[in-house]
C-alpha cells in the first residue's frame, strides 16, 4: 500500500508543477487573478485573489446559484395571480343563490288581487 501512496503523491506533485510551469493563457501559482477569469488554470482563491493548483474552477458554482432564484420566482408568480381571483369568484354564486329566495316570497305580497 505504501507504493500506491507514493505514486499518488508523485501524481499530485506533477499536477502542481504543471500548473506552475503553465501553458497558453495560464498564470503561475501565487500570481494575482480575478474571479471568473480563465487566466488561472487552477483555482482563483477568493480571499487572497491568488492562483492555487486545484482542478475545477469555481465558475461552475456561480450559474447554479443564479438559475435557482429565477426558477423560484417564475413559478409562484403565476399561481399567486390566479389564486385570489378564484377565491373572490367562489363565494359570489353562493350569495346569488340565497338572494332570490326572499324575492319569491315578496312577489305575492306585491300583487294584491283583492282590490
From Swiss-Prot:
GO cellular component: extracellular region
Cystine connections: 26-41, 33-44, 40-51
Keywords, alphabetical: Disulfide bond, Knottin, Secreted, Signal
Entry comment describing in which tissues the protein is expressed: Expressed by the venom gland.
Signal peptide: 1-22
Principal place of residence: secreted
Cellular compartment(s): Secreted
Region annotation (Disordered) ranges: 54-115
Biased composition (Basic residues): 68-77, 86-115
Origin: domain of life: Eukaryota
Domains (record comment): The presence of a 'disulfide through disulfide knot' structurally defines this protein as a knottin.
This protein's name: Cysteine-rich venom protein 5
Amino acid at each position: 500500500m505504501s507504493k500506491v501512496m507514493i505514486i499518488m503523491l508523485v501524481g499530485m506533485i506533477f499536477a502542481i508543477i504543471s500548473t506552475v510551469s503553465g501553458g497558453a493563457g495560464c498564470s503561475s501559482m501565487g500570481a494575482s487573478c480575478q474571479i471568473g477569469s480563465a487566466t488561472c488554470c487552477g483555482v482563483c482563491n477568493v480571499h487572497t485573489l491568488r492562483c492555487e493548483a486545484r482542478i475545477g474552477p469555481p465558475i461552475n458554482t456561480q450559474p447554479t446559484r443564479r438559475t435557482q432564484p429565477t426558477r423560484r420566482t417564475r413559478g409562484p408568480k403565476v399561481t399567486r395571480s390566479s389564486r385570489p381571483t378564484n377565491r373572490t369568484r367562489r363565494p359570489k354564486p353562493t350569495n346569488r343563490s340565497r338572494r332570490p329566495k326572499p324575492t319569491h316570497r315578496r312577489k305575492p305580497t306585491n300583487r294584491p288581487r283583492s282590490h
